[in-house]
């Protein structure tokens, strides 16, 4: 006790908590204030701890919760302590108010204190409940795609609509309010979406903003043009037959341009072009994964690339050659470069180059010599074959359960064994998961 009254800091604490003069008729009902302070401290400590492990992303939110519950030391205790303390906090607040009303704490000379407490209560209620305006628990997406607010907390949120056109399946949100919607009961269960595509989306664990099928119909093209006007973000082209996909980004009003380049005009990804020619356009789907909320400029274009890069690393698409996002947004040729290009490729030179072989035909003698040269060309020697094989590497194919499917001396033999292209295996070896056709895992045997 001597230390409590002699130490400078402990003396102050002692004067307020132990030796403070109190009325003789005080009771335990005056403990609510200190209990509320304890709840507030617990909320802050547990909230900061949970924020260290929580990921506020629709693709990773549930996984981060499972990580907290399973992997973090006493994470389950921290999570339940945070949620239950919040309920206890408001319970004690109402008891605190009831005590004050019973003993007339709202009368003079404590009227100002009571008014300040009322303002604090209103702010707490606004913070606690209006924050749920965009929470999944307040929204119900029915099978018809309409979204209704179950909580009916505030009328400031305009209704989120979903429009359907023909056989096109898409989800539409109010672009002036939010760029993305999320709900625990997704409208991806809609009967308008093909079962195959729904399975792929569920396996990937994504929540797309727009989904378009039947890409072989011109009405789908018009719908994409209409819905994605002035929008920017990340898109995906999905092969519903092989479950392979391509991921890319588009700046403002460029979604339809990217769609046409890849799917219609075949001036985009060569891998996507070959896949569409092999599996037909009707077996592909165009998906808008995420929307960038701001107008893309040269200054903030890096943020859009970071968004694309996040999906590239998260989903690891098979149709993408590059594993990192890149863009030439904002690049312009200088006037000097433009003039050089004009000087090098003048109209006279273009005409001259184009007329080199125009109207020319090989003579029958030349055609016969070419044919004879091709037919008499000797086959590849054994020595050359050995050199070619020496430049390849042995690989091992595993099933998804890590059992060995087969060992092959060359990548070409492995490709023939599973009926795929040699480049498919080479691309898989460069990825982290090393998945081939989502059925096998390939590893370089030469490293072992």
UniProtKB/Swiss-Prot annotation:
SUPFAM superfamilies: DNA-binding domain of intron-encoded endonucleases (SSF64496), GIY-YIG endonuclease (SSF82771), Transmembrane di-heme cytochromes (SSF81342). Residues 1-132 are annotated as: cob exon 1 encoded. The mature protein may arise from proteolytic cleavage of an in-frame translation of cob exon 1 plus intron 1, containing the bI1 open reading frame. It is found in: Mitochondrion inner membrane. CDD domains: Cytochrome_b_N, GIY-YIG_bI1_like. Pfam families: Cytochrome_B, GIY-YIG, NUMOD1. It is an enzyme of class 3 (hydrolase). InterPro entries: Cyt_b/b6_N, Cytb/b6-like_sf, Cytochrome_b_N_euk/bac, Di-haem_cyt_TM, GIY-YIG_endonuc, GIY-YIG_endonuc_sf, Intron_endoG1, Intron_nuc_1_rpt. Coiled coil: none annotated. The keyword Oxidoreductase does not apply. Changing residue 362 to L: In strain: FGSC 430. Its EC number is 3.1.-.-. Keywords: Endonuclease, Hydrolase, Intron homing, Membrane, Mitochondrion, Mitochondrion inner membrane, Nuclease, Transmembrane, Transmembrane helix. PROSITE patterns: CYTB_NTER (PS51002), GIY_YIG (PS50164). It comes from the Eukaryota. The keyword Ligase does not apply. GO terms for cellular component: membrane; mitochondrion; respiratory chain complex III. GO terms for molecular function: DNA binding; endonuclease activity. Mitochondrial DNA endonuclease involved in intron homing. To endonucleases of group I introns of fungi and phage. This is Probable intron-encoded endonuclease bI1.
